[in-house]
């Protein structure tokens, strides 16, 4: 099929192009309670073809881009027609000219990690066993679950001779936990792992069952006021994603962010801790065939790397790093238990928690929180929290070993 696409590109007189081939083998398992409802194997194979069109507009060089998806079942004529349409579309979708990444070539890179040691079917089986091994809370149960175990081959080719290939395995899915008494409550959770970390899923389910049982007895008695807010897991990650977004070339070039290398992102330090954050490479190459590696993005509260794909990086005059999907933040200097010695509001579940990376404001409506007033812990629901990362970053505390952060924020009871 690669040869068919290349021949069609030549016939369509498309000189600049990139092909991204994806071949996936997926084992899917679906459960209702503990009963396996359905099991299936799914194989998909597709080619995402990007075509580029260079031209001038008002005397300035432009580069247009368009893309189409091709599957092996399509005929040579169908492929040619799609590519001609993409070429035509690219001539109307121009941006100021930018250079594409340099040529990359390598031997196929085998999948690494513990997931590569077992089949997709076996991985799905083990994660299912781990998920239901935790389903032993007398107050709550796993209502339903879905597990998807994938083995993916990615190959990227370009007109400049680029030809890289790598394999990657991962497991993701979702489950719903339910508690029926004294109030019927259901809570949705998702998960994703790139190693055979069954213990992590088991712990996640155990926590989810405990929290849904607490949600069923939670009371809407959160007073309005200002609290030491503790966030963990996905909620903490959502807040910290602000720093990843603001240091991206896609935010800096249009002027949405004024950050540059060396910018202090915590200019008003009080009793908080300096951030140290790292972009984590989950694959060896980006979709543009840019080599990916771990990069320090925030070091001691200052920007160390601006990051992004080829186009925005070219406009800024920086090295293209590729687009990252994961990051880590170094642990803080206090333990989670120390963090909870002072009065706090530990919000563990929201109906919708969001971070606005343009303004730095974040917040959401509370579904479940633990309120400690200095003497006792109450399980509460209702109300909302909102705040600005810019206003509280100087007092942010991070803990170890759990991924949690504490800031001081106002809460409002509706």
Tell where the protein language model's regions lie, with residue ranges.
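Short, compositionally biased leader-like segments
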Residues: 2-26, 243-278, 323-344
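Acidic low-complexity segments
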Residues: 5-7, 15-28, 76-166, 206-234
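N-terminal alpha-helical targeting/anchoring segments
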Residues: 25-88
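Short beta-strand elements
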Residues: 45-59, 164-194, 297-299, 366-373
């Amino acid at each position: 099929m690669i040869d068919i696409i290349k021949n069609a590109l030549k016939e369509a007189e498309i000189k600049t192009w990139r092909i991204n081939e994806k071949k996936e083998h997926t084992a899917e398992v679906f459960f209702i309670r503990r009963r396996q409802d359905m099991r299936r194997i799914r194989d998909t194979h597709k080619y995402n073809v990007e075509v580029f069109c260079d031209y001038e507009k008002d005397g300035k060089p432009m580069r247009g881009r368009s893309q189409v998806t091709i599957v092996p079942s399509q005929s040579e004529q169908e492929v040619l027609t799609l590519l001609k349409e993409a070429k035509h579309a690219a001539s109307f979708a121009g941006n100021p000219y930018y250079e594409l990444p340099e040529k990359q070539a390598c031997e196929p890179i085998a999948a690494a990690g513990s997931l590569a040691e077992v089949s997709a079917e076996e991985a799905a089986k083990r994660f299912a066993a781990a998920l239901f091994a935790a389903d032993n809370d007398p107050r709550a149960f796993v209502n339903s679950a879905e597990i998807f175990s994938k083995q993916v081959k990615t190959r990227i080719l370009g007109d400049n001779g680029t030809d890289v290939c790598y394999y990657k395995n991962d497991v993701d899915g979702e489950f719903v936990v339910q508690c029926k008494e004294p109030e019927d409550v259901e809570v949705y959770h998702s998960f994703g792992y790139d190693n055979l970390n069954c213990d992590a899923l088991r712990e996640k389910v155990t926590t989810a069952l405990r929290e849904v049982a607490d949600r069923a007895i939670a009371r809407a008695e959160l007073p309005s006021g200002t609290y030491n807010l503790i966030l963990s897991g996905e909620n903490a990650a959502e807040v910290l994603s602000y720093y990843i977004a603001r240091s991206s070339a896609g935010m800096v070039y249009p002027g949405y962010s004024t950050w540059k290398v060396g910018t202090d992102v915590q200019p008003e330090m009080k009793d908080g801790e300096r951030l140290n954050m790292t972009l984590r490479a989950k694959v060896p190459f980006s979709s543009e065939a840019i080599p990916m590696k771990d990069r320090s993005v925030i070091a001691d509260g200052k920007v160390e790397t601006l990051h992004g794909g080829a186009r925005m990086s070219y406009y800024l005059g920086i090295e293209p790093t590729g687009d990252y999907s994961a990051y880590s933040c170094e642990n803080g200097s206090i333990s989670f238990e120390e963090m909870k010695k002072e009065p706090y509001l530990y919000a563990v579940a929201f109906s919708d928690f969001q971070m606005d990376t343009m303004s730095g404001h974040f917040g959401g409506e509370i579904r479940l929180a633990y309120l400690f007033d200095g003497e006792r812990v109450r399980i509460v629901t209702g109300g909302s929290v909102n705040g600005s990362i810019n206003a509280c970053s100087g007092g942010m505390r991070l803990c170890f070993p759990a991924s949690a952060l504490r800031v001081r924020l106002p809460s409002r009871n509706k």
